[in-house]
Regions:
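Alpha/beta-hydrolase superfamily serine-hydrolase fold, recognizing
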Residues: 1-109
Length: 109
């Protein structure tokens, strides 16, 4: 179990967004399941150590890289799923947000 995204919350979201498990593997819902990941734009991916979907994010970063795409990936091991909105209350979350913004800026130049 991870806070704040736990099994009950994940089940709620899945049941709401994917009734009867329809479209769980649709590329827009699960980009890592896309059959062709080649020739995509550069990606900046940040995953969190305490996140039930961390492994999916890590696998997606590896799959993009294996397909020949430019990928910048950080796993912020001490953070939770919601770290992107916690920058004002957590120094570690703030540092993670700054790092991701700097990485994204490199690709946007």
């Amino acid at each position: 179990e991870c806070f704040p995204l736990n099994t009950a919350t994940m089940n709620f979201f899945n049941a709401t967004v994917f009734p009867n498990d329809e479209n769980l593997d649709h590329p827009l819902a699960n980009p890592a399941g896309n059959k062709n990941l080649a020739d995509l734009p550069p990606a900046v991916i940040g995953t969190a150590g305490f996140d039930p979907i961390r492994d999916q994010g890590n696998a997606y970063a590896k799959a993009l890289e294996a397909a020949g795409n430019k990928v910048t990936h950080h796993c912020f091991t001490s953070l939770t799923h919601s770290y992107l909105i916690l920058g004002r209350v957590s120094h570690a979350a703030q540092r993670a947000c700054v790092q991701l913004a700097q990485d994204l800026a490199v690709y946007l130049k």
